UniProtKB/Swiss-Prot annotation:
Residues 1-38 are cytoplasmic. This is Tetrahydromethanopterin S-methyltransferase subunit A 2. Residues 174-193 are annotated as: Disordered. It is a single-pass membrane protein. Its main location: membrane. The keyword Transmembrane helix applies. It comes from Methanobrevibacter ruminantium (strain ATCC 35063 / DSM 1093 / JCM 13430 / OCM 146 / M1) (Methanobacterium ruminantium). It comes from the Archaea. It is an enzyme of class 7 (translocase). The complex is composed of 8 subunits; MtrA, MtrB, MtrC, MtrD, MtrE, MtrF, MtrG and MtrH.
Amino acid sequence: MADKKPTAENWPVVSGDYIVGDPESPVAVTTLASHNEDIPAAAGAAIAGPCKTENLGIEKVVANIISNPNIRFLILCGAEVQGHITGQSFKALYENGCDPEKKKITGATGAIPFVENIPMEGVERFQQQLELVDMIDNEDGGAITAKVKECIEKDPGAFEEDSLVIKIDEERYSKKSSFVESSSESEKIESEA
């Protein structure tokens, strides 16, 4: 069995519309505009749910992934979100990161592709911790189940670094502030984007 690490306390750390499975599973699944999260959850995903926006939605997914070092794969499946183009924005963030000052996702084509509450440390951790699996526009339950199981079989073990917790204050979202805490170092950093 692959080596595992503890998740952040009270994982998932950010609320949302998702199903939580085994926190030691190496797979997270974003069903984009589709609501078939029960399929990947039943197949063994750690967490599965829709993500409809290319800003706060992506921030929530990133925060929940990097706070669980056992997650090593993010499967993007389900219907692409029209206008927001959330799946493509995830791919752009993973492949290109974002502008360190403006926090715009480099190469994203969505309407408002900004990750203003995720510090660069969080973006880099997202890029390093996992492998992105592109099944955008695929809603086939059998194919999604097979891919989740395939990723579980390829589990490389937990990411070498401990949980990285990013707290997103949704009520103050427009103020663009975030707090980062490394679970191994209990230091807090406030960043203004």
